[in-house]
Amino acid sequence: MSNFNNFEQVEMKVKAAQKLVGYATMSMDHQQLTDATDAINQARSQLEKMKTLATDLDEEFLVKQEEELTQVEQQLREAQI
């Protein structure tokens, strides 16, 4: 798989995590919260993988994805308190 596709995967996984966290925090359903946590973990894993392959040109994109993922992680943590 090309790096371009891997970067697209980062963005898709972050967006999926955002949606799942949104649904889970509205419903507070245990399974949805678990699924949202899994989606965050998958997005984080893909993001960390791509950081090792990134060039300076990729940094802005990765920083944006990191910020969005961190925000959604915080949203999920707050919902679970």
PLM feature segments, named:
Residues N3, F7-V10, L57-I81:
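Charged low-complexity stretches with an acidic bias
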